[in-house]
Amino acid sequence: MTSTVESLSSVKKKISFEIPAERVSAEIEKVFGQIQKRAAIKGFRKGKVPRSLVEQNYRSMMESDVLKNLFDETYFKALADHKIFPVSHPHIESDEVKRGEALKYSATVEVFPEIDVKDYKGLEVKRERFVSDVAPVEARLNEMREGMAELKPLEEGKCAETGNFVVIDFVGSVDGIPFEGGAAESYQLELGSGRFIPGFEDQLVGVKAGEQRTVEVTFPEEYGNKDLAGKAASFAVTVKEAKVKELPELDDEFAMQFGEFETLEQLKTKLAELHKDQETARIKADVQDRIVKALIGNNEIEVPSTLVERQLQMMLSNMKNRLAQQRLSLEMMGMDDESFKTHYRDSAESQVKGSLLLEAVAKKEGITVNDPDVEAKLRAMAEEAGQDFDRVKDFYEQNHNAKENLVAHLNEEKVLGYLLENAVVTEVAKDEL
């Protein structure tokens, strides 16, 4: 067997194989012999079918088995010989399998690009300046107040208004045919929240518990699901409950419900501290993102489409999980899988580029993650979650993928820290970013 490698691009290689005629013929004989033992043709006992009939009736099976066997025998050896580490499954193109003739086939795979990262020191980035502000604290207090609110049934005979809640069953249809993602049961909706298609919530203002109503809407032309965009839809809605929200007073008694506080002022002080921590983390994430974008701007690289697709699939899965927790779906957000991937493809590609470039910097600068780094992170995680350190450590020791992801995250953090230490960072107000 001989194999040669052709670079089709910085991330794609084509391996061409030629298997000698003698080896091909021997494999054909072996495979036909195996098929003959189990071949079933009317008029012959199993295993007693004449060879000529086996070859006549099982030609395609033979070719498939021979190709698979010769592929397994040659492909992985060639990867090792040529030091190729694919990130994708191979795309196979093959000649017809014939006795007495050499077999030529090719395997095209995607690989990691070879990156000579440059201009990663002295990156110029802006960092938002933290400014203390009471408004976010007041907003958080109102959120907590909303969270402690009670939903009580509307007075009998009273109609639901904007700001009230309704619990509904609904089934949506276009031209009388129900569509995917257009139905739910016992869905709680705040009227006026804008969570549904324009016009849907407005038509439920004035309903009463027990009422049935037909809601007519038209999906926006720019709606993410192309099958529904611009189409008129009808929703059969049953109102199971109508509720009004009652908010508690903001006072010391309210603060005491959150455990460690005796006064409202103590609660406000704690919220201010938490807000500062959150803003510091947000600003850090933002400047890290800017560092990565600057790094990408200085290093034009090609990335394997396979890695972009994997990143997109992970983003899609995460989005679906978040929506499911809110009893929502992509369709309710005006998207489907394809429109989501189209919308976020550039973002996914940038994330892949960033990861590969950060890894290249780590390799060039000898930045690594050691056991003390991992232990320190696990201790911080255990403390934050209020869990026993040994229990957290055991979990990661027993879950290889989880630990691998943790180490990768720590490595990126180290590299980003290095880049920031060597960057030209200018602090500016938020509106100057």
From Swiss-Prot:
Protein location: Cytoplasm
GO cellular component: cytoplasm
Catalytic activity: [protein]-peptidylproline (omega=180) = [protein]-peptidylproline (omega=0)
Keyword Nuclease listed: no
Stored InterPro entries: PPIase_dom_sf, PPIase_FKBP_dom, Trig_fac, Trigger_fac_C, Trigger_fac_C_sf, Trigger_fac_ribosome-bd_bac, Trigger_fac_ribosome-bd_sf, Trigger_fact/SurA_dom_sf
Annotated ranges, domain PPIase FKBP-type: 163-248
GO MF, one example: peptidyl-prolyl cis-trans isomerase activity
Top-rank taxon: Bacteria
Xref: PROSITE patterns: FKBP_PPIASE (PS50059)
Main EC class the enzyme belongs to: isomerase
One record GO biological process: cell division
Membrane spanning residue stretches: none
Primary location class: cytoplasm
EC number(s) stated in the UniProt entry for this protein: 5.2.1.8
Keyword annotations of the record: Cell cycle, Cell division, Chaperone, Cytoplasm, Isomerase, Rotamase
Protein family membership: Belongs to the FKBP-type PPIase family. Tig subfamily.
Domains (record comment): Consists of 3 domains; the N-terminus binds the ribosome, the middle domain has PPIase activity, while the C-terminus has intrinsic chaperone activity on its own.
NCBIfam families tied to this protein: tig
Function: Involved in protein export. Acts as a chaperone by maintaining the newly synthesized protein in an open conformation. Functions as a peptidyl-prolyl cis-trans isomerase.
Name the UniProt record assigns to this protein: Trigger factor
Organism the protein comes from: Geobacter metallireducens (strain ATCC 53774 / DSM 7210 / GS-15)
